[in-house]
Amino acid sequence: MEEYAREPCPWRIVDDCGGAFTMGTIGGGIFQAFKGFRNSPVGVNHRLRGSLTAIKTRAPQLGGSFAVWGGLFSTIDCGMVQIRGKEDPWNSITSGALTGAILAARNGPVAMVGSAAMGGILLALIEGAGILLTRFASAQFPNGPQFAEDHSQLPSSQLPSSPFGDYRQYQ
């Protein structure tokens, strides 16, 4: 059940890692711009300088964190596809849970369980929303009536007529 074409697994990991880095850097840059602007001293010049400093300092770090998450998630997902032999939403849900657990391993088993639960629930919600959107979009374009391709099954009154007359008389 593949809705869209994706790269094969070795390249998918690199692609997802780069996409996550880009998303984290851009999103983190926007967030840090507001945060740096808000936390700077009064004055437009001070606030703009504080905003740019916050962007330069934190946006690459956030991008790197997102890249680690995306790379680990894709690696586990590709491993699940290889082991199970099929690509379905359960791979993504399990990959999200395992990614959360692995990234929280330094904080202890309680944090691992909590992060695994959050990762699994988050990915289950994302996969569920994707399935619902796919079903809703497919309901917008129902299959029309199917036409018979074999004209021998049609009665002679419904056969398409030729602009050059009735060709059956020469058979």
UniProtKB/Swiss-Prot annotation:
> What are the Low complexity biased-composition ranges?
153-163
Which example biological process does GO assign this protein? positive regulation of protein processing
Q: Which UniProt keywords apply?
A: Disulfide bond, Membrane, Mitochondrion, Mitochondrion inner membrane, Protein transport, Translocation, Transmembrane, Transmembrane helix, Transport
Cellular component, GO, one term: TIM23 mitochondrial import inner membrane translocase complex
Q: How is it modified after translation?
A: Degraded by YMEL1 downstream of the integrated stress response (ISR).
Q: Where is this region: Disordered?
A: 147-171
Domain of life, per lineage: Eukaryota
**Transmembrane stretches, start-end:** 17-37, 63-77, 113-133
Q: How does it sit in the membrane?
A: Multi-pass membrane protein
Q: Where in the chain are disulfide-linked cysteines found? A: C9-C78
Q: What is its main location?
A: mitochondrion
Q: Which Pfam families match?
A: Tim17
* Recorded GO MF terms: protein transmembrane transporter activity
UniProt subcellular location:
Mitochondrion inner membrane
Report the family membership: Belongs to the Tim17/Tim22/Tim23 family.
What does the annotation say about its assembly with partners? Component of the TIM23 complex at least composed of TIMM23, TIMM17 (TIMM17A or TIMM17B) and TIMM50. The complex interacts with the TIMM44 component of the PAM complex and with DNAJC15.
Which NCBIfam families has this protein been placed in? 3a0801so1tim17 (TIGR00980)
What's the stated role of this polypeptide?
Answer: Essential component of the TIM23 complex, a complex that mediates the translocation of transit peptide-containing proteins across the mitochondrial inner membrane.
The entry's protein name is Mitochondrial import inner membrane translocase subunit Tim17-A
